[in-house]
Amino acid sequence: MASNQKVIYVYESFRSTTPNFLGTLFVENVRGRESYSFEYDADWLKSSANYMYLDPDLQMYAGRQYPTGAKNVFGLFTDSSPDRWGRLLMTRRERILAEQEGRKPRKLLDSDFLLGVYDETRMGAIRFKLDKDGPFLSDDSKTPTPPWTSLRTLEEASRQFENDESGLEQKWIDQLIKPGSSLGGARPKATVLDTSGNLWIAKFPSKHDDVNVGAWEKVTHDLARLCGLDVPESMLIDFSKYGSTFLVRRFDRNGAARIHFASAMTMLGKTDGASAADGSSYLELVSFIKANGAAPKRDLTELWKRIVFNMAVSNTDDHMRNHGFILKADGWHLSPLYDVNPVPEGDELSLCVNEDDATISLDLALEIAPYCEISTKDATAMAADILKTVRDNWNRLAAECGLSRSAQEYMRPAFSLALE
């Protein structure tokens, strides 16, 4: 039986700007199928005796540990890996290299995708090496993170890349692979650096868009801010006739310091695709915050208001990957809101609100308010304020984002709860 092992050295940069050796990730490859195990570094465990766990499948003790259930890879490392867009870029790059070298394309495995993300823009604060004395991976000191001034070029590259059916135009891959491989989701995107040294995510128009997705995400983002929700800084720029580019400042960085981010999928021990269909619920997020949150009262209120807001704008893509937590010195905090978009035909959320119902219904949200330690009186007032804010501002914000009256009428059903 053909087998070989890859040893990956794992570091964290969330306790200081100096990387700390976290442990060793072992990847066993048997006939093209990988299996994973991880072992914490003994010194890291000693220095982190009272630290919060990083993954429910990785308990704070010495010795090899293995993923449980249907998972093949620990969620801690899934969060550091690219999603569909980044994987597509890496797969296309491998096809190009194979053609240049006159060989068959190599099938990329999970560890290839994990190590193929550029360290400089990798999400969160987990980092990887194949040699303890070598660079963090992936490394490319010759090509820095693209500056703000390259946004127009990057948008054009993403469009050409999507329209290149052969997938073998290297110049588009070269421009997109570094800034885009670190990010999740399926849409074209890239990380760029502003003049103050801050990282931003740029989400570009896609050829598959039926509406101006970037403009509508900016509308909902600004509505969330008006509703008092925790959202990062954002802006909207038009570079072409194909749609708007939505930019949002990354919340996993504070200057040069990295902030550890974990998706709710990871911290709740879920697998990709977990949804209302299998009973995944907001109540599980509530339980996690109560058990592990550093500021449970604040985060429970914030989470409940987000549920109401998601209903008010019909954000039906609120799955476990689109909720997350950031790790600070005092423990886990609910991350800022991200990836919120209106859906005109949406009538159910991705997650159950209570134990078994995902319907967009204010009554359901009010039903679980006590679990979030919010009185019925306060919840009713908060919900009324959110709905009024959405009702009074969505048209105005849409117009400010350049959306036509017909575009607004098309999207009107998404705001039906607020308009009732």
Identify the role of each PLM range.
Residues M1-M320, G324-E420:
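Phosphate/dinucleotide-binding and metal-coordinating scaffold of catalytic cores
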